[in-house]
Amino acid sequence: MDNSTIESSIGQIRKRNGKVDSFNMDKITNAIYRALAATSKADRGLAEELAQGVVSKLMTQGFSASRQPSVEDIQDMVESTLIENGHSEIAKAYILYRHERRKVRDEKMKVLNTQTLDPVAKHFDLNCLRVLASRYLLRNNKNEITESPSQMFERVAILIAIGDLLYDSTLFTKDGNSKQNTDEAHSYLEKLDSFDYKFKIGDYYLNKYHFRSLINHYITLANKGQMKVGFKDLLTKIAAKQFDNYAEKISEYYELMVSQDFLPNSPTMMNAGGRLGQLSACFVLDMPDDMAGIMKSTSDAALIFKSGGGVGINYSDLRQEGDIVASTSGVASGPVSFMNIINTVTEVVKQGGKR
């Protein structure tokens, strides 16, 4: 019996999260092969033979397309098949492998504060998930994680695709001669909550912050005379699924990030499709040579750090240490003293935030 016939006979399996997935005999073969490799007996042919034995036991015990085995059922069958075929050493390696996998799985769920792992969490190693949990995954006001890694990458991918959508040839013109009234678009900013997950591109729903980004992008382009349609007409077109082809873009961006072939900068991961919406990583600020300007730059730097951005500051306008300050008849403390102030402020903000 070939693999395709076997797989169709079993049909599906029940995963730990309760979902049903297609039965794949290669996964059993690969698990056994890893156990063989752990005992320095890496033999693909033997792994395939033992996997066939596991499937035979499953079918003998009545598992079929109408009675799906669970992941645990299959793993128990692997252990018993190895022992029954005289491979006790390999069975021990498999049991240890299974135990280690369970430990990693439990630790991942603890890090993400969840009872189940999505496909991305299963694929990413523990250190990656620790970084995502500490810096990038959204949290509520109780500091509890509120999204999975898959949801985070989807949130980012949707926002990136919104920019592409507005440059669609049916919406965008380069000549700048298309006049649209943006008052209507502005009015939607006052009722964002009413549009949370109301519109979607393909199967991807826009949350209220995606919707806000759509409005702001539209207003920017409309003010340049580059939007061919009014904002209400744009929403009508989205609702009519005229731009569902951009779901492919969302999926493409998503897969690039999940595969780690490409990752955007930190603020984009933190804020895309979120409340702050600040995507830029680097800012340059001037430091004017007066106290009000110095404090304003200090405040701006703190707010940028709070949103996940980084700051470079031009101190060249500040007078050197010891110069006379006419307004107070005192002397200037110099750029280094204000560098220390900025450093202290941003360190405090960094420790309490994501930067």
Regions found by a protein language model. Name each.
Residues 1-355:
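Extended catalytic cores of very large enzyme megasubunits
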